[in-house]
């Protein structure tokens, strides 16, 4: 008995000594605190009364990180500082944060004391990693959630699931899969954004939720909003507000892969006007540029084929005279004979892997380099924007496409490090380049971008993400709904899909657009698209203009016309909601 008492006394003393040493290693800062424990330097800082940044680095190895996503500067927040049961307690007017300086664990609570989330004791690790010859780390951060707590976010994932509990995701942005290391818990009213752009892993198991990434630090933001709307307001406060888009962007868009000539595009618009069916925008897909013996050496040259588009300025003007807008596609990769490729290559601003189209030799530019973004815009502006006066951009393949892929491709250098370390932010930076340059040049047109990929924060660039090249099936239509919801719950409000699905060739053997089975799918997809932020008909392998499905008086034509007209009757509601999203972060 005496032995047990002595052992208990020794254990108690040891615990008290450990806590005392930890407390002595804790330093208060103006917005929070910092400490060193478990081989890590930890800094906890309030960015606002409801946003907390947690920043961890290996002990004695500080890293000055500049975020590509976070635009908010820390507010001056009154933080109360105290000790409670060996833990450091930080309080704002909204949140209470407990930091265990012995274990590195951090728990987040409402000011009333209700626990929201726990950054796990001993849950952060740094394992040495060679990143293309540069010393780095495999960083892992682990969190504890309630057993039955649902979470959402993570990105656009085509798996048909909404709740992201008990799932694992290899977070690498590709066609149809658009990830961001973020999740929200609307039931408890909080969200976490893990500020990392590398190819990463998301893992939620009964034991823990974890992010695992390549990097020099564990850097995340805890946001409390009370409910889903409140959370999204916090996300936009941190990563940028969504600008209000023009009224015309909420009308009907017609597109296909592709209109081969300026006359074909213009005639489609004229026919819609003759039928008195509302339409606001025509979209021009790829290969309007010169085609040299079909080799794609002029791929994405930001110029027009003189035979098929002999007078692009007149073409754009005619579209405008018909009271419609013009959106035109641009890609991040360049063919071998383009002036952009030559200039960027001479300056070491090409990422040397194969991108679309196959066997073309096209390569993507180093979007992480601000000078490369300047060069990209220089040609885009001269060849298209200031020349024909288009109204919007369709930025395709913004992941970007990666074909003939080799593992060594991810070691390729960019302006900000290895491609592997920043890959998932490619779309964010590409859209940044277009939006910021257009805004600097022109105050007359708001930036409007349709883009195939995305990352949290991209909402600030006037972007509308579409779900990529999805197949024309009922199963894929069903998957659009949870994919859209999880994507927009990251604070990115504008999302859409190709009405009818992009790849529709399977229906050609049975009549194509006249096939009753395809017509039913297309009409159902259009009904879904009517209530999406952008209503856009697009696809390949069979035409999608309304008259290809029949004529007025036939059910498929009439059903589409009914939905298009409904869209326009809803415009007062849609535009008012757009204002709420922009002005109130609704």
Q: Where in the sequence are the language-model features?
A:
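Bacterial Sec-dependent N-terminal signal peptides
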Residues: 1-25
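A low-complexity, Ser/Thr/Gly/Pro-enriched, surface-exposed linker/loop concept
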Residues: 30, 45-88, 126-128
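Conserved structural-core and active-site-/substrate-pathway-adjacent residues in large, well-folded domains
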Residues: 44, 94, 182-183, 272, ...
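Glycine-rich, histidine-containing beta strand-loop boundary motifs that form or position
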Residues: 46, 56, 92, 99-101, ...
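Catalytic and substrate-binding clefts that recognize carbohydrates or anionic sugar/phosphate headgroups
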Residues: 83-246, 256-257, 262-263, 269-274
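Glycan-recognition and catalytic regions of carbohydrate-active enzymes
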Residues: 164, 543-546, 550-586
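Short, acidic/polar
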Residues: 261-271, 373-382
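Aromatic- and carboxylate-enriched substrate-binding clefts and catalytic-loop regions
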Residues: 278-560
């Amino acid at each position: 008995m005496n032995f047990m008492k002595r052992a208990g006394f020794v254990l108690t003393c040891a615990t008290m000594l450990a806590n005392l040493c930890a407390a002595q290693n804790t330093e208060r800062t103006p917005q929070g605190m910092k400490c060193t424990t478990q081989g890590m330097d930890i800094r906890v800082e309030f960015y606002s009364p409801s946003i907390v940044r947690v920043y961890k680095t290996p002990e004695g190895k500080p890293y000055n990180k500049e975020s590509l996503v976070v635009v908010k500067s820390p507010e001056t927040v009154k933080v109360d500082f105290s000790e409670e049961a060996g833990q450091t307690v930080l309080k704002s007017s909204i949140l209470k944060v407990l930091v265990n300086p012995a274990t590195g664990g951090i728990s987040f609570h409402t000011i009333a004391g209700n626990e929201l989330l726990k950054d796990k004791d001993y849950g952060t690790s740094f394992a040495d990693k060679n990143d293309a010859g540069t010393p780095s780390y495999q960083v892992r951060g682990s969190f504890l959630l309630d057993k039955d707590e649902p979470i959402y976010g993570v990105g656009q994932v085509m798996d048909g699931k909404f709740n992201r509990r008990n799932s694992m995701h290899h977070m690498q942005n590709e066609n149809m899969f658009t990830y961001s290391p973020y999740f929200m818990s609307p039931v408890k009213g909080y969200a976490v954004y893990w500020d990392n752009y590398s190819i990463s892993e998301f893992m939620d198991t009964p034991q823990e939720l974890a992010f695992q990434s390549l990097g020099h630090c564990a850097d995340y933001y805890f946001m409390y909003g009370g409910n889903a709307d409140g959370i999204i307001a916090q996300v936009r406060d941190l990563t940028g507000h969504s600008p209000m888009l023009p009224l015309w962007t909420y009308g009907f868009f017609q597109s296909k892969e592709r209109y081969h000539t300026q006359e074909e595009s213009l005639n489609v618009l004229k026919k819609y006007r003759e039928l008195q069916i509302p339409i606001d925008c025509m979209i021009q897909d790829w290969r309007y540029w010169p085609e040299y013996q079909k080799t794609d050496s002029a791929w994405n040259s930001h110029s027009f084929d003189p035979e098929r588009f002999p007078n692009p300025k007149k073409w754009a003007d005619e579209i405008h005279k018909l009271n419609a807008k013009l959106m035109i596609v641009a890609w991040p990769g360049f063919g071998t004979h383009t002036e952009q490729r030559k200039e960027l290559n001479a300056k070491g601003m090409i990422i040397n892997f194969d991108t679309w189209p196959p066997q073309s030799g096209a390569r993507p530019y180093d979007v992480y380099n601000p000078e490369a973004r300047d060069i990209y815009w220089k040609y885009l502006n001269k060849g298209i924007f200031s020349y024909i006066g288009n109204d919007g951009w369709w930025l395709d393949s913004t992941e970007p496409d990666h074909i003939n892929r080799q593992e060594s491709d991810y070691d390729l250098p960019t302006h900000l490090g290895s491609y592997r370390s920043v890959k998932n932010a490619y779309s964010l930076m590409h859209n940044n380049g277009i939006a910021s340059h257009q805004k600097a040049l022109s105050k007359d047109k708001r930036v409007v971008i349709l883009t195939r990929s995305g990352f949290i924060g991209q909402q600030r660039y006037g972007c509308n993400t579409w779900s990529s090249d999805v197949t024309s099936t009922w199963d894929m239509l069903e998957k659009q709904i949870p994919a859209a919801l999880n994507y927009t719950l990251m604070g990115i409000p504008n999302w859409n899909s190709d009405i009818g699905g992009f790849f529709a060739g399977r229906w050609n053997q049975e009549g194509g657009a006249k096939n009753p089975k395809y017509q039913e799918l297309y009409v159902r997809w259009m009904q879904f698209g009517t209530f999406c932020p952008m209503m856009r008909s697009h696809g390949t392998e069979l035409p999608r203009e309304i008259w290809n499905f029949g004529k007025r008086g036939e059910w498929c034509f009439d059903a589409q016309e009914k939905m298009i007209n409904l869209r326009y009757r809803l415009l007062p509601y849609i535009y008012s909601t757009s204002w709420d999203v922009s002005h109130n972060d609704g």
